[in-house]
């Protein structure tokens, strides 16, 4: 879909009042379910312990390449000048000092630092998977390669960007008055653009889930805006309240840095929750929604889709499943797929599509009931798409389960104890 078409689609949906209200409620419930503030606190705690190993890895990678080594100081200065509150600037000196002392570490100490960094990165991935309702994770080796690639290439790309920008701003064009104005504007906008690009790529790469650009971009915009507001708010507060320096003295930067890291994670996770909500939200009229308690009907229809896809020798992507079965929500689809993956019935291929991993002749309804823990509904409800082929066979299978159960449930509770006697 073209960017202009996507924007027009968003505007059209925003004018649909019922859809907008429904999405607002859905988004609020997702915010509450994700427990973002608690997750941000946990990530802030682990991030503090990962700052030193992160600095060691980044500066170590840059020092390994002479062409990048001389840009490490400029990179550090740029990061702390544009992304960290001035009151926490003292942390830069400590991190550089710790990085310079990395050569004195023993092998066990270095391994401990790397492990703490990997734990932090793993915590970030787990939090993002939780936000996107992904139950499965990448294989350990794949995760390690992704983390290492992001750290090493990220450091080199950042240093290379500084080098290129320095060469560009040294051109005669930027020596004129108009050129200086343009350079000043670019320098002001660069931190915001960097935040936006980094967060967008984070939303695309980190979750073990296919995140589309049209969902990642709005979340990244929200996160970048919140980050700028937080940066301005902390600066305004610290500028009018100086008592913290008298209270904490030379370590005054520590609580400020902790607060800044926490608020950064709050902004990023709020943006991630918006992105996942946009991908998961499916607006349907009431008559086309799957009634609560009839998820087993949706499960049988879902397996029917996989049965037909397997006969054609192909898999099904999440978007295609939701298009074929619009009654399913993204959250329900992810829950069902993860449950079926646990019993080896589904698996993902290298393209992220779901495939049947076992023949359905080897699976009983009892297996489905035990792995999903879905209820067998008793009351009559209007079910969407009950008259198509999948609807008829799924409803017939469900009736075979629930109609005898309905008769059994008509039994009086007192009948259970009729023959038990008067005493326990």
From Swiss-Prot:
Keywords, alphabetical: Cell inner membrane, Cell membrane, Membrane, Transmembrane, Transmembrane helix
Main localisation: membrane
Membrane topology: Multi-pass membrane protein
GO cellular component: plasma membrane
Residue ranges that the Swiss-Prot or TrEMBL entry lists as coiled coil: none
Subcellular localization, as worded in the UniProt entry: Cell inner membrane
One Pfam family this sequence matches: Virul_fac_BrkB
Ranges annotated as spanning the membrane: 48-68, 101-121, 144-164, 181-201, 216-236, 251-271
NCBIfam families documented for this protein: PRK04214.1, yihY_not_rbn
Family membership noted in the UniProt record: Belongs to the UPF0761 family.
Listed PANTHER family: INNER MEMBRANE PROTEIN YHJD, UPF0761 MEMBRANE PROTEIN YIHY
Protein name stated in the entry: UPF0761 membrane protein Smal_0716
The organism of origin for this protein: Stenotrophomonas maltophilia (strain R551-3)
């Amino acid at each position: 879909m073209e960017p202009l078409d996507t924007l027009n689609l968003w505007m059209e949906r925003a004018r649909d009042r019922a859809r907008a209200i429904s999405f607002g409620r859905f988004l609020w419930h997702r915010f509450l379910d994700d427990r973002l503030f608690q997750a941000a606190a946990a990530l802030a705690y682990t991030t503090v312990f990962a700052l030193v190993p992160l600095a060691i890895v980044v500066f170590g990678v840059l020092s390994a390449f002479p062409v990048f080594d001389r840009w490490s100081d400029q990179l550090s200065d740029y990061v702390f000048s544009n992304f960290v509150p001035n009151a926490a600037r003292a942390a830069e000196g400590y991190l550089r000092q710790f990085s310079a002392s990395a050569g004195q570490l023993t092998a066990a100490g270095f391994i401990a630092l790397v492990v703490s960094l990997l734990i932090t990165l793993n915590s970030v991935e787990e939090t993002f998977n939780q936000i996107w309702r992904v139950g499965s994770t990448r294989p350990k080796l794949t995760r390690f390669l992704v983390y290492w690639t992001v750290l090493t290439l990220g450091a080199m790309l950042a240093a290379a960007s500084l080098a290129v920008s320095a060469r560009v701003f040294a051109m005669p064009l930027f020596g004129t008055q108009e050129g200086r104005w343009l350079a000043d504007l670019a320098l002001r906008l660069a931190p915001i653009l960097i935040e936006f690009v980094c967060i967008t790529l984070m939303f695309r790469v980190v979750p073990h889930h296919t995140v589309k650009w049209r969902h990642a971009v709005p979340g990244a915009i929200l996160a970048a805006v919140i980050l700028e507001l937080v940066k301005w708010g902390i600066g305004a507060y610290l500028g009018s309240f100086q008592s913290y320096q008298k209270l904490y003295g030379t370590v005054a930067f520590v609580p400020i840095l902790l607060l800044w890291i926490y608020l950064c994670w709050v902004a990023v996770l709020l943006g991630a929750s918006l992105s996942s909500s946009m991908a998961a939200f499916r607006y349907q009229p009431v008559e086309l929604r799957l009634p609560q308690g009839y998820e087993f009907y949706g499960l049988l229809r879902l397996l029917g889709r996989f049965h037909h896809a397997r006969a054609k020798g192909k898999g099904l992507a999440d978007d295609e499943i939701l298009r074929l079965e619009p009654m399913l929500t993204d959250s329900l689809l992810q829950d069902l797929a993860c449950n079926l993956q646990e019993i080896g019935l589904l698996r993902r291929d290298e393209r992220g599509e779901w495939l049947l991993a076992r023949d359905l002749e080897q699976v009983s309804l009892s297996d489905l009931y035990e792995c999903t823990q879905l209820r067998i509904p008793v009351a009559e409800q209007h079910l969407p798409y009950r008259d198509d082929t999948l609807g008829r066979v799924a409803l017939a299978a469900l009736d075979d389960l629930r109609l005898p159960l309905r008769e059994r449930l008509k039994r009086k509770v007192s009948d259970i104890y009729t023959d038990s006697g008067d005493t326990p």
